């Protein structure tokens, strides 16, 4: 109803404007054919104005008080009328919408209607709103939080992997160290065993040589002492042991005294013969006693020297090198 009222008001206003703009109120100048004259001296035809005009122009008889419009004025009038009518129509629509909005009956825009429809569907059918459930309507902060959580999980996985790798490497290093330690112990044991075997062999060989020297009656006492000392010093140098000149002189003196003692022992009742090499048994006993005799020369000298030579001369039968001044 209010729309019709507003439209009527706008139409009335438009009509008034049109009548003011295009012609109303002008009268045509009198002149030309007047009265009922059909022919005059000026060749004008006169008859009833209404009849002639009706015959020529048909039933649409123009007003005799109005001037006939020209072509230009008619075209301008039509164009202006169309423009004005369009403008007035738009203005009328705007005024109508405004009046309807004021009384609460105005229409809504397409965007507002779409929003209303969306809100209605979301409230009425929440299970159909898959787009919202998928998180499409979430804010960018939620997306950032999700990315941060993913990064945390990835970092945790990387740290866990590095920890596992480090533990595996540590276990591997332990196993390698254990294998190397066991191998080293075995090698050390084998080396010690080999060294002991070599030492025992060298000890027996030295003892045999000393016995051989002592059995050689063709050698004088001084020669026997010199040979024994040479054998002992060679044995020491092979083991990396060296003596000073004073130590060598002291050992030479001891060896000389021990050689005299060995000769005296070979003539006692134990062997029953003055000849050292008379029998194999006698020779074996002489070897043992000779070795013991040679070892005993270290009594009374420095303990470090005695300990060193003890490693070379003690074979289980002999007593080895004793320390200071103790003697059997």
Curated annotation (Swiss-Prot):
Alphabetical keyword list: Capsid protein, Viral genome ejection through host cell envelope, Viral penetration into host cytoplasm, Virion, Virus entry into host cell
InterPro entries documented for this protein: Microvir_H
Keyword Hydrolase found: no
One protein family per Pfam: Microvir_H
Domain of life of the organism encoding this protein: Viruses
GO cellular component terms, semicolon-separated: viral capsid
GO biological process, one term: symbiont entry into host cell
Chief place where the protein resides: virion
Localization (cell): Virion
Subunit: The virion is composed of 60 copies each of the F, G, and J proteins, and 12 copies of the H protein. There are 12 spikes which are each composed of 5 G and one H proteins.
Function, as annotated: Minor spike component of the viral shell. Involved in the ejection of the phage DNA in the host and is injected with the DNA in the periplasmic space of the host. Involved in the determination of the phage host-range.
The protein's name: Minor spike protein
Source organism of the structure: Enterobacteria phage S13
